[in-house]
């Protein structure tokens, strides 16, 4: 990436976003969707946190934890996909607090009536709305973006309709260029949209590593 292109990318991305809330990740939480967008597992690999803007947010995730079975055996428990919505307007840090999940009985109770808490930096509970994401697709591989969009359009307990309208397929992204000074080729428009989104999700250290890598790339 050329230095000039990198500077343009940063000029587009950084001034319009203020990172004010840190979402601390948990190794027992598999984050699937953030604010209507699929979360890349490669992006989160090794990351301890995600930086968020102040305001309403929605997470779709699964709880994954090793539980004990009779006879000193163990198995990996994976919860149904859950939806949680909350507001970080006056919050600088968000932490997961999961209930005790050590055996089959506790896992069954969690499946039937999931409960967990989000805590701020002072370990105070954050108001949340929690629900199970009912999967409507019969496909072998679930598209959680689409399932989340359907959920947000259905006026459920943890629905946030604004994230349903923000969902966009490639054709929508290609036509949404109002924030750009000039209209680049379509493929570049889509690339910029995706790069900006991933850059916003990354924690400061990941962003720093990305910029170091980008500056070392030969001109295209």
From Swiss-Prot:
Keywords for the protein's UniProt record, in alphabetical order: Signal
One Pfam family hit: DUF2057
Transmembrane segments: none
Keyword Signal assigned: yes
InterPro entries: UPF0319
Leader sequence residues: 1-20
Record-linked PANTHER family: UPF0319 PROTEIN YCCT
Assigned protein family: Belongs to the UPF0319 family.
Name of the protein this chain belongs to: UPF0319 protein YccT
Organism whose genome encodes this protein: Salmonella paratyphi A (strain AKU_12601)
Lineage start: Bacteria, Pseudomonadati, Pseudomonadota, Gammaproteobacteria, Enterobacterales
Gene name per UniProt: yccT
């Amino acid at each position: 990436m050329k230095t000039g292109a990198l500077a343009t990318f940063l000029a587009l991305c950084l001034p319009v976003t203020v990172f004010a809330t840190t979402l601390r990740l948990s190794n027992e939480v598999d984050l699937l969707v953030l604010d209507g967008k699929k979360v890349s597992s490669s992006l989160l690999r090794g990351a301890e946190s995600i930086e968020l803007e102040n305001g309403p947010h929605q997470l779709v995730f699964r709880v994954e934890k090793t539980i004990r079975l009779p006879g000193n055996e163990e198995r990996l428990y994976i919860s149904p996909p859950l939806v949680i919505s909350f507001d970080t307007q006056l919050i600088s840090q968000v932490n997961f607090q999961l209930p005790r999940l050590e055996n089959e009985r506790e896992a069954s109770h969690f499946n039937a009536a999931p409960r967990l808490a989000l805590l701020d930096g002072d370990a105070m509970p954050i108001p949340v709305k929690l629900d199970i994401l009912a999967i409507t697709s019969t496909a072998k591989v679930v598209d959680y973006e689409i399932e989340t969009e359907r959920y947000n359009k259905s006026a459920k307990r943890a629905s946030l309709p604004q994230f349903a309208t923000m969902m966009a397929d490639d054709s929508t992204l290609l036509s949404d260029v109002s924030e750009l000074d000039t209209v680049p080729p379509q493929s570049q428009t889509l690339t910029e949209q995706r790069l900006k989104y991933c850059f916003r999700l990354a924690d400061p250290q990941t962003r720093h590593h990305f910029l170091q890598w980008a500056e070392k790339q030969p001109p295209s």
